[in-house]
Amino acid sequence: MVMEQAGTTSYSVVSEFEGTILKNADSFSYFMLVAFEAAGLIRFAILLFLWPVITLLDVFSYKNAALKLKIFVATVGLREPEIESVARAVLPKFYMDDVSMDTWRVFSSCKKRVVVTRMPRVMVERFAKEHLRADEVIGTELIVNRFGFVTGLIRETDVDQSALNRVANLFVGRRPQLGLGKPALTASTNFLSLCEEHIHAPIPENYNHGDQQLQLRPLPVIFHDGRLVKRPTPATALIILLWIPFGIILAVIRIFLGAVLPLWATPYVSQIFGGHIIVKGKPPQPPAAGKSGVLFVCTHRTLMDPVVLSYVLGRSIPAVTYSISRLSEILSPIPTVRLTRIRDVDAAKIKQQLSKGDLVVCPEGTTCREPFLLRFSALFAELTDRIVPVAMNYRVGFFHATTARGWKGLDPIFFFMNPRPVYEITFLNQLPMEATCSSGKSPHDVANYVQRILAATLGFECTNFTRKDKYRVLAGNDGTVSYLSLLDQLKKVVSTFEPCLH
């Protein structure tokens, strides 16, 4: 660690992104994410196979060539909005998991914050400004042709000299008080020479930095998208590529068995193929003849929530759906009740179904991967007093079973492609009458109460975010699923697995 002029008050800071704000100095896995999410499996594999070449270029100090090769393979032929979409919806989660809190402690104590990265600016800017509260982001600039496609080239000839010049232009006539850079002084941190004081990561815990009152935690990532669970380092990416053929076969077997076996038998058979269901609490008995059914109010983690609930109960419980694909409906082993988003019509549908028996509803209206619960719709509380809260959670190793940007019809397939998917179900006690609308409580009070007890059970936090908030952040729309023709759906499947034809 090198430190100069330790007494300087840090009102402005210029920090390198890779290896300083992020603990890991290697940006390869983030280009792999762009390749997979924006271009597809083939581009993902090509970039992985070029990793030894990229590593050799780095070792022999051809760092600009290594960077340009990564950028070219990951981005050529894409439209810039596709890269922006990945940077908005996918990358922030992986960046946040790698943020050095010691660096953040120093960075956040300064009033003016500048981030310098060798990656394309479009890949970093949104995260840096929204989550790290950076004022400026200096990175490489992608060249886009007149047809709107990225050429895979960048405007900078010498990336590090360009960064130095742009930092100097940003602080014309004055010097930034503090510079943060990689552990060793390299060409990529030559902008530190402009700073009155500079520190090399790792930042010491007892470093006396700036204005302590300005420190804030990074804005958490509540919504994120993308299919990959783990950051695709070269080793992880290779394992994923090797697993995919076996995963597809395993998913087909699991889905077939789920369709032909009795519901009560599925949890036992699933253990043979690596699945596991953990049940806590006491499930209620089926409703007696002539009595209205129980409304199971579940947290919403994946499309499989109501299906797994039916497996555990050993009987088919219809599920209220807000917006799912036709393929998901076809594959579902339980009946689905599609809502219209017209309040009176939906209320009548739910009441009618409850008169026949039990029903499952997920009042968040959409899934959330992080340990947060979205705002609960209060409609369910108006329609019945027989409410059983159910806390649902799941763990997967390779692939997420939800998407906001992709085709939802592949959600169950990706779920069953995981080697050892685990579901946890906790049945809470049925709400007492004094906690329902029958005692004079408002539907919103009941919904908020159910949200709180479910969040407490899972160790999650309650939020006021809605499905519209989620889809506006991740996909730039309101989350409505359109019903495509069979040809359009097949095109979507092909584009998911082979979208390298840009």
Curated annotation (Swiss-Prot):
Transmembrane segments: 31-51, 237-257
Family: Belongs to the GPAT/DAPAT family.
Topology relative to the membrane: Multi-pass membrane protein
SUPFAM superfamilies in the cross-refs: Glycerol-3-phosphate (1)-acyltransferase (SSF69593)
Main location: membrane
Species in which this protein is naturally found: Arabidopsis thaliana
Protein name as annotated: Glycerol-3-phosphate acyltransferase 5
EC number annotated for this UniProt entry: 2.3.1.15
Annotated compartments: Membrane
Keyword Lipid biosynthesis: yes
Motif stretch (HXXXXD motif): 300-305
Tissue specificity as recorded in UniProt: Weakly or not expressed in roots, leaves, seedlings, developing siliques and flower buds.
Domain observations: The HXXXXD motif is essential for acyltransferase activity and may constitute the binding site for the phosphate moiety of the glycerol-3-phosphate.
Job of this protein: Esterifies acyl-group from acyl-ACP to the sn-1 position of glycerol-3-phosphate, an essential step in glycerolipid biosynthesis.
